[in-house]
Amino acid sequence: PIPAPHIRDSFVHNGQDWLLMTALPGADLTHSVGRPDELCNVLATGLRALHALDTGTCPLDRRLDAQLADGAARVAAGLVDESDFDPARRGLTAGAVLDWLMAHRPRGEDLVVAHGDASLPNIMARNGAFAGIIDIGRLGLADRWQDLAIACRSIIFNIGQAYVAPFLTAYGAEWDEARYRYYCTMDELF
């Protein structure tokens, strides 16, 4: 099993939803940026373990059809924060991002149980080893590049482009520019 927080309680206070969860030991990977090789290995180990889970037992659908439908609903409801777009898409509208996603959809999906937002703050480490995942609201059955793209983007932002190749090598994948661009663009809608 993959360690993750357990929900202890949920409630609404002053119109705000709250979850009370257990803590995981260790610290998120942003605390490991001074040890980039260790960070890459922990991230790769954690994602390999998550992606090795049996897809047949995952009831959560985050395949492209589901993500594009959710993204379209968020665009229609005005829930996409266009001011938070990455520099490559700054100045675009949420509708333009959705249109690009529809026009550039990759063929086929390499389905795994994916985290959905596999950035460094959402992966926990303890004593140089993988300790679990947090912020799993987008977890579900999805293309493995859903996680690899977000992980690579987070590596670039936090420790630099030079560490993408060691991370992918440790994970056991090769760079896929088209899928990287696609899933980073998809992330703008969420």
Predicted regions and their residues:
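ATP-binding pocket architecture of kinase catalytic cores
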Residues: 1-63, 74, 108
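Localized chelating/binding microdomains
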Residues: 5, 39, 141, 187-188
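Regulatory N- and C-terminal appendages and interdomain linkers associated
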Residues: 15-16, 188-190
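An acidic site on a long C-lobe helix of protein kinase domains
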Residues: 39-42, 117, 144, 163
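Active-site catalytic-loop/activation-segment of kinase and kinase-like phosphoryl-transfer enzymes
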Residues: 45, 61-105
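Active-site Asp-x-Gly
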Residues: 64, 108-113, 126-185
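Conserved catalytic-loop position in the HRD/HxD motif
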Residues: 112, 117, 122
